[in-house]
Amino acid sequence: MRFFAWKENFAKADALIVENRPLPMFLCRVLASRGIKDSASAETFLNCTQPLCDPMELHDMEKAVTIVRRAIDEGKKILVFGDYDCDGITATVLLYEYLEGEGADVCYYIPERLNEGYGLSMKTMEMVISSGIELIITVDNGISAVEEIKRAKEAGIEVVVTDHHALPQQLPPADALVNSAFEENSSPCRYLCGAAMAFKLIAALEQQMQGEDPQDLLLEQYGDLVAIATLADVVPLKGENRILTRLGLEVLAQTERPGLLALAQNAKADLAACNSDTISFMLAPRINVTGRIGSVDTAVQLLLTQNEEQAVALAAEIEKLNAERRRMEENISAEAGELLHRKPALLYNRILTLVGDDWHLGVIGIAAARMLERYRKPCIIISCSNGIARGSARSVEGFSIIDAIAACSERLQKFGGHPMAAGFTLAEEDIPAFTAALEEYAAEHYPIMPVHTVKLDAPIAPEEITVANVEEMSRLSPFGCENPMPTFLLPGVTVQAVNSIGNGNHLRMSVTAGRYTVPMVYFGMPVKQFPFSIGDHIDVACALSINDFNDQRTVSVRVINVHPTGWRQGENLRAAAAFEAVVRGEETADATEVFTRNDLAGVYRYLRDNSPIKTGTDGIYYILRKKLDGYTYFKHLAALQIMRELELMEDMQPEGFVIKNGEKKVELEHSQTFRRLQKG
């Protein structure tokens, strides 16, 4: 079970009810939870009435337009230098396609992730110089390439940087620096992604020629790419990002790009009814995979081609890569699980750090995100090869992983990222010192670590779950970073029925509240792992959508997480923090509970008799606390850890436990955790 946390105060919803255009109260609660304080702001947000910004007002845009237009007119050799993620790929395609259409002498280059790494390098720059390039335009990179751009300038090459990443202390000596990070935090353009910045450059070039704002017309041609990049790069969907994504989704629904049509067909995505999820979970991962484990040029050619047969062939190649990526991810997760079985104390570090040999660098970030979901804490996956270690980190809200890494960076060869995700490189021999420094940093700055939570927008009553209300909720779209699909809490309902669906991988259940019955689906939760029984009282975190089937529209309720009603969340959080401190050998005043042999015996007997246990730590706690007197969350965590250390129990993947027969007698004193608890 994940812990629940409310967003902003949804009780302020009354201020958002517009006299002439009343909104459903539950929608007002969602708006209030997202910091929208008055009716005027609500109308602007819901209707996307804010006009697009003048591209010429962006930092150095006039300089950039002058340089690029002159290069086009004079037939100079132009290089579009991109990045290997979805944002960088689409930005490259967008700008290259435009410049080629303008008759420019243009080519593109995107470095390969594994062999070259991110951004401009000296080796690449020498290649660019020798090829006779006269103008470099970077997209989705360049702002930190100080030495590389200095070398380009020495060789007489003009450089225009378009980027959106954080500004370094020393800026590169480019001829123009067009970066959304230069804009004020209040600017609608502050959080534009790389492809959106490339779009702004195109718009400025067109505006210079036409004398009027061309952005609406340009979006008809490039809006699909801008929307894909914005959602794929997980930039905040506020300001202009919200407008560009909403308009871009409309363009994507009617796109004629053969590559996107072929990609969508393989993903079984209906572009005519596309939404944010279509991009985030179907299209973007497939574009990204070429930069992770394949050749990024496959995706570029897919998006550029006008040949349907070529598009189908390229999309098929990408589909194979995506299947291979899944296999790699599963292998890393399995090896990580084996590592945790051998070293279970790793689970109780403030930052879960797992180290392996030759794990694919294009996949370790995805694996880190999966481990974070399961263990509810920041996670770092490090892959070692030939003495070099490369890590990918994912974090939880409230703990900036990039700040932590930066504070411990003296042993790092390079690093970068943002509060929720980061990457780094170091010598393999420096891993122990680096991870120890991270733990010290976390202990000093976060006595109690933030945990991965389900962010709730507002409570909802069963009678509010109607087609009309959910249709109104669509006005909040597009959904994404800082504007996710609303998560509602349906509190105090009773489990009426639970059935297995999807070959046992998911479940469908019905809950009741008074005279109302609400059917819902819990994806990824097999019935065997579901700890609740008919008649149990539960609180359900859920998302709502419309299901169209046989010309009938009904509300679909998707379960995100479930708590037993009355779940002592705060108490359990404190117990978890106290127990983790015990395992780490730290002194803590909170670890005052007495743990006895009898506590362990009762837990072991139940788990042995019901092994394998196909539910998680919290699920089995819910079951055991009803069977064992005085069974607390602290004792539960202690019992599981002691059984791990004594090799009486093994964690299953993706969740659950298997108990070993235990034919030979074990001594509890052989468990370090048991000994520490006796001292306490």
PLM segments and residue spans:
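Catalytic domains of riboflavin
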Residues: 1-2, 477
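Hydrophobic helix-and-loop "lid/oligomerization" segment in the mid-to-C-terminal part
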Residues: 2, 9-12, 16-134, 155, ...
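Acidic, two-metal ion nucleic-acid-processing modules in DNA metabolism proteins
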Residues: 95, 100, 242-285, 289-339, ...
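Residues at the C-termini of beta-strands that transition into short coil/loop
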Residues: 112, 179-181, 383, 563
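Active-site cavity-forming subdomains of large catalytic enzyme subunits
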Residues: 126-195, 199-212, 221, 238
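Short, glycine/acidic-rich beta->alpha junctions
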Residues: 140-144, 359, 363, 542
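Histidine-centered active-site/metal-ligand motif
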Residues: 164-165, 360, 418, 506
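Short alpha-helical basic/polar micro-motif
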Residues: 196, 365, 369, 540
